[in-house]
Amino acid sequence: MESKAIIEEVKTKPRKESTSSSSSTSTSSSIEEDKTNHLIIDKNTIDIEYQKLKHNSEDNFEKFVSEIEEVKVIPKKSRTCCNNHKNEHNYLLEDEDRNIEEIVTSKGFNFEKHFVKTEDGYTLALFRIPGGKNCEDGSKLPPVLLQHGIFDSADGWVCNGEKHSIAFVLANHNFDVWLSNSRGNKYCKKHDKYRTNSFEFWQFSFHELGIYDIPAVIKYIRNENKSGEKIIYFGHSQGTSLMFSGIVEKYDFYKNNIKLFVALAPIARLNHLGSTLLSILSDISLHKLMSKVEAYEVCPQSDGTSNFMNFMNQNLNGLTNFFIGLVSDDNSKECNDQNALSVYLKHFPCGTSLKCLIHYVQIIKEKKFIYFDYKKDANFALYHQKNPPEYDLSKIKDIPIMLITGEKDKLSTPDDVRWLYNKLKANVIYLDIVPNMGHLSFMCGNNFSWFKEPLEYIIDEFYPK
């Protein structure tokens, strides 16, 4: 990818009309359309009058666009609604008591378990869906890696039914799909030296995931996949934070191994946080509070937690929606399908380290995308300065990036994504702020039509016929 000053700036192109073709690159059979106007931005140039935006987009989008220098945008084309979404969700409860392998194989896909050792001694579980249904060998298909967010696991990518889960849709479009798990979640509690009840085991934040976990996983995938293709990386939430930090720290490695970085609900700076719960947590000394009881793990998965959350969802759905609104989504109605939530909540939360949470609290307090703050003396030893430095996002070059967030996301807010875009815009080839979408909507939302456009874009731009 050329790295000029945005080449000709980020502009728009009209998307291709979907056809009834049964080709593996057609998205029409898997993702239906809605009638919402999006703002889509990419580098392909075409002369389109900017005045159309003023008449067709909502005020908040006009504000968003007006502050992006010299960018021309148009409203996304009209789309028809996902009419069969509720019909599919009638069958979702069958997945409620299934593990991830059972969910995948019950839909006719093959499933593989792999284990990867990191440089610093952790053993990670890595799952694979090698192409479409009954595909025995996905080794020559283009590889895709999906990395979950905080408190989540690989399960999150398959909990929303075959037609509305990113992992299944990509597999059905003949990608070799790999699902990674972060150290410390329910699948990754083994270390060469430390036990899971030790302080040392839990000394990691998203920073370590970006410099140890994902590089180990990528090396493993490229060895198993024989296509010779670089990897398309999808990250959700923390899955984007670790990639931003990882590229800054290990630029050459990622440049040589990543074909495209798709950032869903990207998290870097958190200056416009709308989450009431996280705002409260940022004012509490979590480290002191939890260290007193030697709590190094946060929100581990347990039958009690899963059963309680599922009971609340089935019997007190309004309370579930309230909690979702409190934490992450300003429009909880977008992910209020009880069947979909029941499946997702059976697999969530899956645990992470206290240090991960503290790192985000520090970012909230400092209003900067900073390295972990170990306090004065340790910072001097590690960073050679009193305060932790910011991650230098200007080091991210020549890696194509797609930024996609929701208009109603309280964590990955449009304002913070705008800041991120301006930091990365020489690399950003696609930008979408999806109306009515929140943070959890990417994993268990009612409407999946948002994925049609980016999937078409990926296929058209990176795998043209």
Question: Where do the protein language model's features map onto the residues?
Answer:
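N-terminal cap/lid segment of alpha/beta-hydrolase-fold proteins
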Residues: 100-131
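Short, surface-exposed "cap/lid" segments of acyl-processing enzymes
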Residues: 131-186, 191
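Alpha/beta-hydrolase active-site loop
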Residues: 201-222
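Alpha/beta-hydrolase-fold enzymes
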Residues: 222-229, 238-380
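Short beta-strand/loop motif that positions the catalytic acidic residue
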Residues: 403-405
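Acidic catalytic loop of the alpha/beta-hydrolase fold
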Residues: 408-412
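Short alpha-helix in the alpha/beta-hydrolase fold that links the catalytic acid
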Residues: 413-422
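Catalytic active-site module of serine/aspartate enzymes centered on a nucleophile-bearing elbow/loop
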Residues: 432-465
